[in-house]
Amino acid sequence: MEKYEGYNLRFKDALIGVQFLFVAFGALVLVPILTGLDTSVALFTAGIGTLLFQLITRKNVPPIFLASSFAFIAPLSFGVKEWGIAATMGGVVAAGLFYVALSLLIRLKGEGFLHKILPPVVVGPVIMTIGLILSPAAVNMVMGKGKEALYTQGQSLTIALISLSAVIVVMMFGRGMLRLVPILCGIAAGYCASLFVGIVDFTPILSAPWFAVPSFTAPVFKLEAVIYMVPIAIAPAIEHIGDMLAIRNVTKENFLKNPGLKSTLLGDGLATSLAGCFGGPPNTTYSEVTGAVSITKAYNPAIMTFAALAAILLAFVGKLGAALSTIPAPVIGGIMLLLFGIIASVGMETLIKNGVDLAEPRNMIIVALIFVCAVGGMVLDFGAMSFSGVGLGALIGITLNLVLPKTKHFDGY
């Protein structure tokens, strides 16, 4: 298909759908591995989330795939340790409803208000803090420290370096579809190195059944978890707009107009809330799959239906989930060194692309306070609720952007 022609369910496209799932697979399973969630549940919620998104945008379905969001790695990890999976999932449901609220406001007031309260001078540094806050966890995994201290430092560093090198080589020199799966290649290379060193335990795979129902977890709503999780949704909400622009450029179909952000954000939000209802990580649009669409010219959104169905089926393969649980921490740590840095650089790119002048005192103040308060570990505790990390940084940025006066020669966004 050389141009976008709308949704057309054809069984001959099923194999392409499986191929697209393969592209998303590495990043999809990485989030639950890092946050202590179930990888099989993540596969299931990615599948049903994508199908729900297609149902909501049925007037003009964009060819995109929804799966685990990297923006929520730090808050999910903290939430699981602090309140448990059930309460953290309550926060995920609420974060999805934040998307829904944004979609309703866009429906009522248009898209302009979104750029007013969330300009690049706020969004850029908030995205950067996500990567910076996560970086110590990656370093600890690479160095064999903390709870992951199951191997010698030499083993950890060697395996992490192999994983990292594989990702870099594929990103730099890969061609075609190979270039879209650097995470998967990094996991494969690191896993092979781990096998050579002899630190992989196959017991979980041997004892797992072929068919197994994922370990679903129902949400429990705890105010602290909800307050902590909702502000994190700001960054992926903006990322969603960027992905809609990207798929528009690839297909030459203006999805920002039809079905419009009011529908795509609604679909993304409800998919995230649905994921929280089952115990899965929040969903977001996957730019890797958009890249695959660009390379293959396979614009039919029904292909994503097959990718979603394949993800749901794989969620019930018990041995797959068990195999993913045997991946040693240094393998993941090596990949995370690069990915968390990339997240931070995406925030920097947001500032640069939009011409945010950091010599302007107003912008300098907003960026500086977001950084120091979010990364420095500041906590605002109001008893029943508290703000810290990325959520606190986002709150400070939004407040300062609305309160600080704009100069006549520069409006700040």
List each model region and its residues:
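Intrinsically disordered, low-complexity non-transmembrane regions of multi-pass membrane transporters
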Residues: 1-15, 202-215, 249-256, 260-264, ...
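Membrane-embedded helical hairpins/re-entrant loop segments and their flanking transmembrane helices
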Residues: 2-11, 36-54, 58-60, 231-301
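Hydrophobic, membrane-embedded alpha-helices of multi-pass small-molecule transporters
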Residues: 14-27, 153-164, 181-182, 214-243, ...
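Transmembrane helix-boundary motif of multi-pass solute transporters/channels
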Residues: 16-53, 57-87
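Membrane-interfacial helix-loop connectors
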Residues: 32-36, 40, 70-83, 293-296, ...
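Short, non-helical or kinked segments that cap or interrupt transmembrane helices
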Residues: 37-43, 60-72, 114-123, 179-184, ...
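Interfacial segments of multi-pass membrane proteins
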Residues: 75-81, 171, 289-304, 310-315
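Membrane-embedded alpha-helical modules
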Residues: 81-201, 308-413
